[in-house]
């Protein structure tokens, strides 16, 4: 335990909190251009082909981000909006692409949780 004198000379250091989403630069979302759109497989207990895209952001960062929902219209050079949020079973994927914004369309025929997938309200029959 330090003495009062030692604390006067050198105060206690605050622990630096490291950002989980460094590429966002403390912004809620960032715009970027897809450089590669592909599928990848998840970690051990799970099995699937997860849709991901490598995105070059406006601040120069290049990140891998997840494309949620069923089906998408992304290809190389598509302009997308990314937000934070990792995918637990995909190592290195710390961002999500926002559906229904810029070049990425919303999920078709989505009835529930529509706002998360950029789907418009369905017409009454």
From Swiss-Prot:
What PROSITE patterns does the annotation carry? RIBOSOMAL_S12
**Family classification:** Belongs to the universal ribosomal protein uS12 family.
Lineage of this protein's species?
Answer: Bacteria, Pseudomonadati, Pseudomonadota, Betaproteobacteria, Rhodocyclales
Which residue ranges have biased composition labelled Basic residues? 113-125
Sequence segments annotated as region (Disordered): 106-125
Q: Which InterPro entries match?
A: NA-bd_OB-fold, Ribosomal_uS12, Ribosomal_uS12_bac
Gene Ontology molecular function terms on file: rRNA binding; structural constituent of ribosome; tRNA binding
Complex formation: Part of the 30S ribosomal subunit. Contacts proteins S8 and S17. May interact with IF1 in the 30S initiation complex.
What is the superkingdom listed in this entry's lineage? Answer: Bacteria
Task: Write out the function statement from the record.
Answer: With S4 and S5 plays an important role in translational accuracy. Interacts with and stabilizes bases of the 16S rRNA that are involved in tRNA selection in the A site and with the mRNA backbone. Located at the interface of the 30S and 50S subunits, it traverses the body of the 30S subunit contacting proteins on the other side and probably holding the rRNA structure together. The combined cluster of proteins S8, S12 and S17 appears to hold together the shoulder and platform of the 30S subunit.
Where in the sequence is 3-methylthioaspartic acid found?
89
| Key word Ribonucleoprotein present | yes
What is the official name of this protein in its record?
A: Small ribosomal subunit protein uS12
Species whose genome carries this gene: Aromatoleum aromaticum (strain DSM 19018 / LMG 30748 / EbN1) (Azoarcus sp. (strain EbN1))
GO annotation, biological process:
translation
Q: What's a GO cellular component annotated to this UniProt protein?
A: small ribosomal subunit
Q: Which UniProt keywords apply?
A: Methylation, Ribonucleoprotein, Ribosomal protein, RNA-binding, rRNA-binding, tRNA-binding
